[in-house]
Amino acid sequence: VLVNNAGIVGTVSPCADLDEGEYLRICAINQTSVFLGMKHVIPSMKRAGGGSIINISSISGLVAIYGTPNVAYAASKFALRGLTKQAAIEYGADGIRVNSVHPGYIRTKMMTESLTDEQIVIASDSVPIKRVGEPVDVSRLVIYLASDESGFTTGSEHVIDGGLTSV
């Protein structure tokens, strides 16, 4: 099992104002590191007869978030969708399943360092179930995807956002 859980927000900036070096740095951490993890584990998984790769993306990898000018974060998380789906079809016959997880607002260090308490309350109110997620919410989904119980699941996008992207 490989869980790629790399991610930084980086500089929040509209496209025209973002420094190219910062864009590349964010993509290197959020996207290229995931590619490298997969590249280096797939041969071992093939020799073992299969495995599960779980790429942690974001709802920002599914939909643009209005009011949050963060082109590099969005681009890097959208890229994980294509990487996941392509690897799923390339290695399915080898018994390797590849899926992505797209969390919404989850109470992590990234959230608490980038949002004020007031902003977290606003985020909670914007979620249909009226709370932000906890890390355990995501870990339960990851455990399922890592297990044999998800043996017929590959190339899938799993949204865990309390219904936020449904509105």
Cite the ranges covered by each PLM segment:
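Substrate-binding pocket helix/loop in short-chain dehydrogenase/reductase
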Residues: S13-C15, D19-L24, M111, A123
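Active-site helix of classical SDR
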Residues: M38, S76, T84
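Residue(s) in the substrate-gating loop at a strand-loop-helix junction
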Residues: S58
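A conserved structural motif in NAD(P)-dependent oxidoreductases
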Residues: V127-V138, E149
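Alpha-helical segment proximal to the catalytic Tyr-Lys
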Residues: P43, I89-E90, G151
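Short, small/polar-rich loop/turn modules that mediate ligand/substrate recognition or access, typified
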Residues: G92, R97, T153-G155
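Short C-terminal tail/terminal secondary-structure segment
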Residues: V9-V12, V142-I143, T154-V167
